[in-house]
Amino acid sequence: VIVGGGFGGLKLANKLKKSGFQVVLIDKNNYHQFPPLIYQVASAGMEPTSISFPFRKIFQHRKDFYFRMAEVRAVFPEKNMIQTSIGKAEYDYLVLAAGTTTNFFGNKHIEEEAMPMKNVSEAMGLRNALLANLERAVTCSNKQEQQELLNIVVVGGGATGVEVAGVLSEMKKFVLPNDYPD
């Protein structure tokens, strides 16, 4: 059983292709998403379907592969069993490759106000918020409120933060003058 269909889970599932093992992949989504391009979804540069690939399609010709869309609720190593949102699953070997969570480093304000971007759903939330703020700013008569709507803070200097900052800069320079001339 492999829990998590990110890069690690997919790599292992592919490595086990001719191993003789029956592979069960469990993920909360029924698709693999390509994290390096999530920022493109957030900036409306790409659609979610361009970076999302259904597990069943990826492994459709594998006879020893099974996919279950579920979330793991508990692990019972002494019983070689996991409890998921759709029931129990037994295993000979268990690999936990469920990915990461956003680290706010104890900053409660950022944790409460920030919009993390670890998946397509969060990227779409960010995209919708950006576009809604742009539309509201166009019709806003209060200059201070308009400035607040257009003020964007990128927290984090990792790959995602740098990519988001870069694409926002490109949008400001090339997209916004054409799409929002007023």
PLM regions: where:
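Beta1-alpha1 glycine-rich phosphate/pyrophosphate-binding loop at the start
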Residues: 1-66, 152-153, 159-182
